[in-house]
Design a protein with these regions (language model features):
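Conserved N-terminal entry element of GNAT/NAT acetyltransferase domains
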Residues: 1-16, 161-170
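Conserved catalytic-core motifs of GNAT/GCN5-like acyltransferases
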Residues: 116-118, 136-153
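Helix-loop element at the rim of GNAT/NAT acetyltransferase active sites that forms part
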Residues: 4, 12, 23-38
Length: 170
């Protein structure tokens, strides 16, 4: 996949991206929201061997990697997505909603009729972005999983249909 909007690029992750991905994934500050406050503890060799992987995407701003996205077909004409703007200086800039818009448009164009995702209940910044894009909150799962340290976590489930989609990449 390769999607471009001004200085923003979404592209398929390659084995050469493994060092950057591992740097982010092993950083507890980057991964805490996903339940890994100590990072994943993975290696460049292990991750390079998994790439390219269907649905694993790199986010670039002016050709500089700043984060990653993923998507997968979950059946019933739905795609599940995820995003991390990993470089903190690029957070809170409105880039996430543009990257999400680009991917969502592409997935709807591929015939998916619904996009689903979940996020940590404590991740209110992400919830705000998802709701601006038109996602509807469908469930809150209280204490439904434990993070890497054994702390109970809650999740919010969202769904989006083409009719509700607010495109920020126009």
């Amino acid at each position: 996949m390769h999607l471009q909007y001004h200085d923003l690029t979404i592209r398929s992750a390659l084995p050469s991206d493994a060092p950057q991905l591992v740097c982010w994934w092993n950083d507890g500050a980057v991964m805490a929201h996903a339940g890994f406050p100590l990072g994943l503890g993975t290696t460049v060799e292990k991750e390079a061997a998994r790439l390219p992987a269907p649905g694993r995407l790199m986010l670039e701003y002016k050709n500089q990697p700043i984060g990653e996205m993923n998507w997968r077909d979950v059946g019933e004409n739905a795609a599940e997505i995820g995003i991390k703007i990993c470089e903190s200086v690029f957070q809170e800039q409105g880039l996430g909603r543009i990257y999400l818009s680009l991917l969502i448009k592409e997935l709807f164009a591929r015939g998916f009729s619904r996009i689903v995702l979940d996020t940590n209940l404590n991740n209110t910044r992400a919830q705000h972005v998802y709701e601006k894009l038109g996602f509807r909150k469908v469930a809150v799962r209280e204490n439904s999983w434990n993070d890497q340290l054994g702390n109970p976590q809650s999740a919010v489930d969202y769904t989006l249909t083409p009719e509700d989609f607010m495109d920020y990449a126009v």
